[in-house]
Amino acid sequence: MLRLGSHVSMKAPDMLLGSANEAASYGANTFMIYTGAPQNTRRKPIDELKIDEAQPIIEAHDLRQIVVHAPYIINLGNTKKPGYFEFATDFLYQEIQRADAVGATQLTLHPGAHIGAGANVAITQIIKGLNAVIRPEQHVQIALETMAGKGTEVGRTFEELAQMIDGVTYNEKLSVTFDTCHTSDAGYAIKDDFDGVLNEFDHVIGLDRLKVIHLNDSKNPQGAHKDRHTNIGMGTIGFDTLNKVAHHPQLPDISKILETPYVGEDKKHQLPPYKYEIAMLRAGQFNPHLIEDIEQQR
């Protein structure tokens, strides 16, 4: 089954109920949320997330494949800041509890950045952090994300991700989020040889680990290490490749999540593209008037 969705908001007063309704309005059958603002630690108690109230919408629209994105402020690779490791692991452990509570199947996590200490030092610290938080009884898998290699990010190669996975005791609780923009920006030939890239992923990590795809076009050329998403078919990867990824026979039932930018010159009145991008991908036909159609929502 083709599972397409997007990032949706989760905010008061409707919380998860609002997230499910937003996803349904886009014609999605999967979705991704942050359990709070990704740049801070403020979180509502689990009993205020309206989890039970959301269930009828989730059932009616087959939205049970929920992805939670861990907050950006968690950097398990940081070995420089005293006391930070305890903060990062405590907060990630709380996010695992929240992801389990909302019924998420995957918790996407940026592995981290070495901030000058070197990739191997950071990877060792990331393994230590994952071993500190993962419990065999948790339901959600932590889906380490492929990174663009911006700055001192680690996880820019399949080998780095495999090294992390191999070092974790309960690594059956680990999976991978494959971001098409990040992976292209990291230097992989997504546009020209996606099958070859997928075969390389299978050889290095194993396709059985691939549980989430972030389906994004890129503003920059292959190998740019920039991480700038753009709308489907409007970037350097292009519609044909992203449509191939969405419908790829080796990737059935995997959540394909759009993180493409809102549309509009006025930042206060930008519009979500997801209903239109999902429809375009389901049809398998590029819409050259995509941006105009989105702007007609006004």
UniProtKB/Swiss-Prot annotation:
Cofactor note: Binds 3 Zn(2+) ions.
Cofactor(s) it depends on: Zn(2+)
Gene Ontology process terms (BP): base-excision repair
GO MF annotation list: deoxyribonuclease IV (phage-T4-induced) activity; DNA binding; DNA-(apurinic or apyrimidinic site) endonuclease activity; phosphoric diester hydrolase activity; zinc ion binding
Keywords, comma-separated and alphabetical: DNA damage, DNA repair, Endonuclease, Hydrolase, Metal-binding, Nuclease, Zinc
Binding site for Zn(2+) 2: 145, 179, 214, 259
Transmembrane segments: none
Binding residues annotated for Zn(2+) 3, in chain numbering: 182, 227, 229
Enzyme Commission code: 3.1.21.2
Catalytic reaction equation(s): Endonucleolytic cleavage to 5'-phosphooligonucleotide end-products
UniProt function note: Endonuclease IV plays a role in DNA repair. It cleaves phosphodiester bonds at apurinic or apyrimidinic (AP) sites, generating a 3'-hydroxyl group and a 5'-terminal sugar phosphate.
Protein family (similarity comment): Belongs to the AP endonuclease 2 family.
Protein name from the UniProt record: Probable endonuclease 4
Organism: Lactiplantibacillus plantarum (strain ATCC BAA-793 / NCIMB 8826 / WCFS1) (Lactobacillus plantarum)
Lineage: Bacteria, Bacillati, Bacillota, Bacilli, Lactobacillales
